[in-house]
A protein has these predicted regions:
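Penicillin-recognizing serine hydrolase domain
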Residues: 1-5, 63-65, 71-75, 86-199
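Active-site-adjacent loops and short helices of periplasmic peptidoglycan-processing enzymes
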Residues: 1-115
């Protein structure tokens, strides 16, 4: 979608797919909405639990159980390195999958965008990205926080859409990939801040 001109190109937009780590976006976005409303603060903490560690090797997984981790660190790990342990802790902090799915539908207006069931559709992800751009999801301050945090993801998470964009053009993206078994998928969703328009 060309956000400035209002033009769209839609191909298989309603075809559901397994989004991989793109499914981290709802819990991150809804947590930022809580920060935006004042319901939570970046300095609020949630204790590390062994049962919520995806790996003992990541930054959250290396911490002993009971460690008080700030929401700020969970969000940075979630967006910058796509940390699964951060996702699992934020999910439980938010009340679990059913709560998140209900809020995703009620607050973001999409039903096909979740970790469990692990399914999404291009038009759902696109709607959320478009609504964030248009200021319907966050206040300007927290929209900038979202763009800055997700936009600072490590280089290995910028091998899809950003790789095809000219240098100097800002791209804020979230990749999702599933390798092994019956699944081999690599997906990406992005907002591109171009010279004459934004997408």
């Amino acid at each position: 979608e060309d956000f400035v001109r209002g033009q769209k190109v839609l191909i298989n937009e309603s075809n559901e797919f397994r989004p991989g780590s793109i499914s981290k976006l709802p819990v991150g976005i809804l947590t930022i909405r809580d920060l935006d409303s004042g319901a939570r603060k970046l300095t609020d903490t949630f204790a590390v639990q062994n049962s919520l560690k995806h790996s003992r090797a990541d930054a959250i997984g290396r911490l002993p159980p009971g460690s008080k981790v700030q929401i700020k660190q969970y969000l940075e790990e979630l967006f910058r390195v796509s940390n699964n342990s951060a996702q699992y802790h934020l999910r439980v902090m938010q009340g679990g999958t059913q709560v998140l799915n209900s809020r995703t539908l009620a607050e973001l207006g999409v039903g096909s965008f979740s970790e469990d069931p692990h399914v999404s559709a291009p038009n759902s992800v696109g709607k959320v990205f478009g609504d964030i751009y248009r200021g319907k999801v966050f206040s300007p301050t927290w929209r900038n926080y979202f763009y800055d945090t997700l936009g600072s993801a490590v280089g290995s998470l910028k091998d899809a859409i950003p790789a095809g964009i000219p240098k100097g053009v800002r791209v804020v993206n979230k990749v999702g990939f599933l390798f092994g078994g019956k699944e081999n998928t690599y997906s990406d969703a992005a907002t591109v801040f171009a010279n004459n328009t934004d997408y």
